[in-house]
């Protein structure tokens, strides 16, 4: 064989290899142009999407629309401390808010777990986290334990960065934590018509006193009095929820205040809880400072809720009542912050 023939053979083989490689590359490019994602990319995308959906599911299980009931008392207690002392520690406020939110969220999960275990939640319930198998019971338990642990860690941080005595901090914080669990777990205050009392105390005076004490370093009675209108507004959220679920709760064999008093008195009680705070704000505005009249701006929404409740259209009424609670609370906090020094009792 001549040297030229060898060179020709080598050239031909090289061309064949190039043809194979080009065919493979062309095929892969064609697949990508048709939207076919390589396997490793598809798996990564699915994992990322699944993680986002899981996070969204956990957030929804917390019922975030109800968090105004715990955030506003913390803001109110902090505002009272600021108005009385003239100083505000933002770090204390943030840690306190996270601690209270963690306990509130954990309490919501405990409520979800026990309502499902007792057969109270069903396909038409507002909370179908476990009914629709969005989460498994063990997922709810683990998430609840995590939130209670987070709350305790925040309480420990407050001990080191606040001047409040340990016994006072533990008394208020663990009192609130116990209430959030025993509302449906353990004793189950919700099931024996005592849930309204627990909510009235925990998400009113107790939370406001806790936030105030963390800022000033001691316990005081004054925040308890300021907490009354906010506590009534917060209780209206629970009462509207219990009135809506009256029939299903009765069939499940549990007793709530709404069941005890009946539809007519439930309507009257709801009006009392919604409108009595406005009377208190009017008295504060006329006797002390006009800034206390700010919450009166929400009266149109209150009358809208009254009409909806009277027509027995309970669709989304707990959420709308929570919105009213948020607005009333925010205007109340602004009213205290804007009040002239020494004008408040």
From Swiss-Prot:
Sequence intervals crossing the membrane: 60-80, 90-110, 141-161, 169-189, 213-233, 251-273, 285-305, 324-344
Keywords for this protein: Endoplasmic reticulum, Golgi apparatus, Membrane, Menaquinone biosynthesis, Mitochondrion, Prenyltransferase, Transferase, Transmembrane, Transmembrane helix, Ubiquinone biosynthesis
Alphabetical list of InterPro entries matching this protein: UbiA_prenyltransferase (IPR000537), UbiA_sf (IPR044878), UBIAD1 (IPR026046)
Species of the source: Xenopus tropicalis
Top-rank taxon, per record: Eukaryota
Keyword Transferase: yes
Pfam families: UbiA
Name of protein: UbiA prenyltransferase domain-containing protein 1
Assigned protein family: Belongs to the UbiA prenyltransferase family.
Encoding gene, per UniProt annotation: ubiad1
Disulphide connectivity of cysteines: none
Leading EC class: transferase
């Amino acid at each position: 064989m001549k040297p030229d023939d060898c060179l020709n053979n080598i050239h031909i083989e090289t061309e064949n290899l190039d043809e194979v490689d080009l065919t493979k590359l062309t095929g892969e490019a064609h697949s990508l142009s048709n939207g076919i994602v390589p396997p490793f990319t598809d798996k990564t995308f699915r994992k990322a999407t699944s993680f986002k959906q899981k996070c969204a599911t956990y957030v929804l299980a917390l019922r975030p629309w109800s968090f105004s009931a715990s955030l506003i008392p913390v803001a109110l207690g902090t505002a009272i401390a600021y108005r009385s002392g003239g100083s505000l520690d933002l770090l204390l406020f943030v840690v306190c808010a996270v601690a209270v939110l963690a306990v509130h969220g954990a309490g919501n999960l405990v409520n979800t777990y026990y309502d499902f275990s007792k057969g109270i939640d069903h396909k038409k319930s507002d909370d179908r986290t476990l009914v629709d198998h969005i989460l498994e019971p063990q997922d709810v338990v683990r998430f609840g334990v995590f939130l209670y642990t987070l709350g305790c860690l925040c309480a420990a941080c407050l001990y080191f960065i606040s001047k409040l005595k340990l016994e006072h901090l533990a008394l208020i914080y663990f009192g609130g934590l116990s209430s959030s669990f025993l509302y449906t777990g353990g004793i189950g205050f919700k099931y024996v018509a005592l849930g309204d009392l627990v909510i009235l105390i925990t998400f009113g005076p107790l939370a406001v006193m806790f936030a105030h004490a963390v800022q000033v370093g001691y316990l005081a009675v004054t925040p308890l009095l300021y907490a009354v209108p906010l506590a009534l507004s917060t209780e209206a959220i629970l009462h509207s929820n219990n009135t809506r679920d009256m029939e299903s709760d009765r069939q499940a064999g549990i007793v709530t205040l709404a069941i005890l008093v009946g539809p007519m008195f439930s309507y009257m009680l709801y009006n009392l809880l919604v409108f009595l705070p406005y009377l208190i704000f009017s008295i504060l505005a006329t006797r002390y400072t006009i800034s206390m009249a700010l919450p009166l701006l929400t009266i149109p929404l209150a009358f809208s809720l009254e009409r909806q409740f009277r027509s027995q259209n309970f669709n989304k009424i707990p959420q709308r009542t929570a919105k009213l609670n948020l607005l009333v609370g925010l205007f109340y906090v602004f009213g205290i912050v804007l009040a002239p020094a020494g004008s408040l009792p």
